């Protein structure tokens, strides 16, 4: 049956109109433009490997059935040439001749096949006179008629086109395919490193009745079934800690988080996160684990810990990594000592002199210290660096430092000037945790939409007893940024983009 005319057909671009007419012509002649299947016998990559030994002009009697997207077409008289490309980018030439397929099939090839079509070709494996491995066709079929033309293959796609039409990007750009493979290899390496150390992977809720586990603005939705407001999770932390309470002493999750905040070269509202917790650990042991995770991921995905970035420079992730402390490093940068006892008003004055916009009502001492530190130091941390010992006010889920009053056992890992991961010695005292939650609730009541609410069920879990624990969260997209030098939208296969 031939489809009826499209009511909007008059408005489509000319090339789409022509291709649609070819599709209709194939169907009207009793052919198939989109068959259920075709008898493919080999991938193009398999053929290239198996017949790499053929000399120029050598022919075989081996018959194969191959498929691929047409990325080059040339036809002269009784012979037509095409280059097919399969999903991984492997290409192979096919030759369609009148002697091989017959006059009608050759004419149909010339009239119906366009760049971008996916075709099936059956024939003998040969090497052309120029030494090009080829399939000399004895038959062909359309496997999927493309109604839209491909972009010009030798021209660079704009970033806008790449992120909005990743499917086109994957067809035409080897770098896009490489990025997807690298991401898969990195995630596999993270899982293997953790599983080899006895960690168990779990899944925790994406929809939550309270938002917690990080300081961020949540996405809000509503459940019709429960007639209640729900939040897309900003972090899985509080549920993974429940697992530790329940006896899963080494636990991790790789999944999506959502934060209703800005989007730029290092931030995406939807992003992938690895979060892991280890009972009987602390922020030192979890830091060692984090270094192993990153280094193993580099080796798995790129074969080396000295990775080559998109701009051609090299970045060394090997060996031991530097550690600095927040208060001493900020003091050295400012030329005056900053401690947990430094008055908030003094910090406000420093920030204003440096041109930092300050919320004088809601920003605590800790928030001011972190903002000053980021303004003065963060961008300068090119080599992998653990920044340790944060203000207590900004880290409500972290254990107080065992020696230093006013700070907590937390580090942020900076790589190439941006934050890659965060690690804690976890707060396991439910009484202190409740006090921290109460302070967060006070900030929320003052209008801080990133502050956490009191999670009574989590506190109930902690009241059953939670062992000393180290925890870490690391952005998968940012890890790819660190390993490749790309922006975050290039490391996410289908990033969120503003609707047109």
UniProtKB/Swiss-Prot annotation:
Alphabetical keyword list: Aminoacyl-tRNA synthetase, ATP-binding, Cytoplasm, Ligase, Magnesium, Metal-binding, Nucleotide-binding, Protein biosynthesis
Cofactor: Mg(2+)
EC number: 6.1.1.6
EC class of the enzyme, as a word: ligase
Listed transmembrane segments: none
Residues where Mg(2+) 2 binds: 419
Protein family per UniProt: Belongs to the class-II aminoacyl-tRNA synthetase family.
Identification of the protein by name: Lysine--tRNA ligase
Lineage: Bacteria, Bacillati, Actinomycetota, Actinomycetes, Kineosporiales
